[in-house]
Amino acid sequence: MPQFMSPAEKGFILSRHWKDTRHGVEVSYWLITDNGPRKVTVPLQQAIAFVPLSSLPAIKPLLDEQANLSYRPVELSDFRREKVAAIYCQQYRQLQNLDKRCQELGIELLETDIRPCERYLMERFITAPVWFSQNQQGEYQLKPCDSYRPLIKAVSLDIETSQYGELYSIGLSGCGDNVVFMLGPEQGSALNNTHRLVYVNSRPQLLDKLNEWLQQYDPDAIIGWNLIQFDLNVLQKHAERYGIPLQLGRQGKKLEWREHGFKQGVFFASAEGRLIIDGIDALKAATWNFPSFSLEFVAQDLLGEGKAIDSPYDRMDEINRRFHHDKPALAHYNIQDCLLVHRIFEKTDLMAFLQERSTVTGLAVDRMGGSVA
């Protein structure tokens, strides 16, 4: 009997996720659609790797002792044009452990580094735009849809701190709102009507306000300038200090971090259901080049305008002075940085470039520096 499927809808992949369960690998995606964000979960998957047929006898005893594992020859070849067998595991962690044991035997398994959420897309020739439909069990099926380019709703985030990294304020511009959350005591209202100025009594309350704003306005993307290595890094340290989760993902999911495999002290950040895009990395990915990638230099070059503090030499002193004696002026400086980043993205059409790159290559929209070979 044919399985009923809901009418197909168009979506564009924002983020990709997987987790092991007792019965298989759960794979899900957050999409932008014409009807808002959607989280879709596909039927349970197996974790898959390959091994040259010539190496199969050496690891066959190891494979045969594994529960919830199967293997068989397939009509595929490796780069040496040797036929391979596919190995199917019920959990991805099981496959990773198997890979380690095979390495100890001097046998290399192929494609063990491909995450289940990436493999699902690859095997269906899906890059970023998709058709999706749902069956009676609530599971989704995805198919490629090359023509869909939705509007990505972005918020520009910028923070101000002391020279010691102590948080002064958080500025947000996007989704119809411009606001600065400022550590008190209160020193007056916003200098003009371009933004709201909201005072709070403590740094934990600054983090709470950020979490609340993101859940209320629900952006598809968070953009900024040196966003991950500075702004989000400082916010994460404050979150750990005060025991407050940094809920930058949709459905209140916490910000996730991983360290660069080769560059010490360089980190990647991800938020479920949202893109995290650093303006500097995005411009470089789009082959823009400047003598300096400082926000002041790029803004002056592209927009003919710059920061709300003219001199770069005593900028830190001026930020400290404004925080202690003129908080409305600091809020103006903070929101101006947010607005500059937005205008740079618009001027260079960066978001459209990143969507197109993702559609052509299959790289995540906010993935920077990956190979497209």
Model-based region annotation:
Residues 1-280, 285-373:
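The two-metal-ion catalytic cores of nucleic-acid processing enzymes
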